[in-house]
Amino acid sequence: MVITASSLSGIDTFVDALWLEEGLSKNTLTAYRRDLTLYATWLAGQNRELNQTTALDLQLYFSERHAATKATTANRRLTVFKRYFRWALREGVVQEDPTLTLQSAKQALRVPKTLT
């Protein structure tokens, strides 16, 4: 599916804002752009745009795409979405934040292999 110009514009504006306001590294900005673009592509397959996202859309996306993904990866992507929608709400691009009801995936505690 093809991402709409509106969705691409929203992603570009958000990433630019992060760079200007927070000075995030190029790698971080690239990862944010990739995660949002993958989600926007999935949304295009549902005939929806990024700024039309509902909590149900995000739940479906995570259940379809992250069943076999590590919790750390799913949580990183959730953080990207939370930051995007918090920004979009502040900028008046969306009326509500669909990430408010979503919870992070549970991660197993890591025990060190050896203690020295």
Question: How would you describe each model-predicted region?
Answer:
Residues D12-N27, R33, T37-P112:
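N-terminal core-binding DNA-recognition domain of tyrosine recombinases/integrases
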Residues V2-S9:
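A detector for short, charged/polar N-terminal pre-domain segments
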Residues T116:
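Conserved segment of winged-helix/HTH DNA-binding domains
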